[in-house]
Amino acid sequence: METVLDSNILPVGKPKWLKVKLPIGQKYTELRGLVDKYKLNTICTSGSCPNMGECWGEGTATFMILGNICTRSCGFCGVKTGRPETVDWDEPEKVARSIKIMNIKHAVITSVDRDDLKDMGSIIWIETVKAIRRMNPETTLETLIPDFQGVERNLDRIVAANPEVVSHNVETVRRLTREVRIQAKYDKSLEVLRYLKAKGIKRTKSGIMLGLGETEEEVIQTMRDLREANVDIVTIGQYLQPSKKHLPVKEFITPEQFEKYELLGKEMGFRHVESGPLVRSSYHAQKHIL
């Protein structure tokens, strides 16, 4: 799932490189007006993404499906956890219509985890992609999926939908996975990514958050693990604490260190590497289809 981080909730003494300008520009203003008018559900707004203005200006937006309540309670994530609502079977059409209204050129679809459902929500996923393709044939797609508990028939539905990019985030290094992603497993995420590639997905992608107490060596090893799983694209960004109830930020990683990881990633053979303090899973997503 797309990492939901509120850029306004930061410890005192936050580094200057984490301060962002308010989004401006005609395209942003137009899209903001449409979102407000039609009450469209984008994770860009609900997650207070610091890159919203830039992405919207380039015709990219991220939509979250299957409700806004997750069955998992990851220590980093600002999405509500609990018992989700009944599946809205009209949601695929609603999302497709939102993309059409906003005239989105490249859409990223993500979701909460739905471990309460027999299909983990995978049927709604494929129906959403079909609806988007039908209503917006020129729009390219990235699906940022949960692990579906590694169940192959659920992953096969995503493969059958054939999005341009399929993403699944490992989020953190192996050692911290149990603390950061309580109900997920590091190796299962790698298996999911490896399976997607083996089944014919052209571009796979994963993301890592930094500042949770990981070491440089662990970050580099995680990047190696992703390459060994044939991942094409990696995003690396700064973890920001959504609220006081969530895991604290242990360290603010410098822009120079992010640049180092970017260079290392390119040397490892990733097709695209997005590495920087404000990078999120969907940052520059439209460029990842090239």
From Swiss-Prot:
Family annotation (Gene3D superfamilies): Aldolase class I
HAMAP family registered for this protein in UniProt: Lipoyl_synth (MF_00206)
Protein name, entry field: Lipoyl synthase
Swiss-Prot/TrEMBL keywords: 4Fe-4S, Cytoplasm, Iron, Iron-sulfur, Metal-binding, S-adenosyl-L-methionine, Transferase
Keyword 4Fe-4S found: yes
Catalytic activities: [[Fe-S] cluster scaffold protein carrying a second [4Fe-4S](2+) cluster] + N(6)-octanoyl-L-lysyl-[protein] + 2 oxidized [2Fe-2S]-[ferredoxin] + 2 S-adenosyl-L-methionine + 4 H(+) = [[Fe-S] cluster scaffold protein] + N(6)-[(R)-dihydrolipoyl]-L-lysyl-[protein] + 4 Fe(3+) + 2 hydrogen sulfide + 2 5'-deoxyadenosine + 2 L-methionine + 2 reduced [2Fe-2S]-[ferredoxin]
Native source organism of the sequence: Flavobacterium psychrophilum (strain ATCC 49511 / DSM 21280 / CIP 103535 / JIP02/86)
Residues involved in [4Fe-4S] cluster 2 binding: 70, 74, 77
Upper lineage: Bacteria, Pseudomonadati, Bacteroidota, Flavobacteriia, Flavobacteriales
Enzyme Commission identifier(s): 2.8.1.8
Gene name of the encoded protein: lipA
Pathway: Protein modification; protein lipoylation via endogenous pathway; protein N(6)-(lipoyl)lysine from octanoyl-[acyl-carrier-protein]: step 2/2
Cofactors: [4Fe-4S] cluster
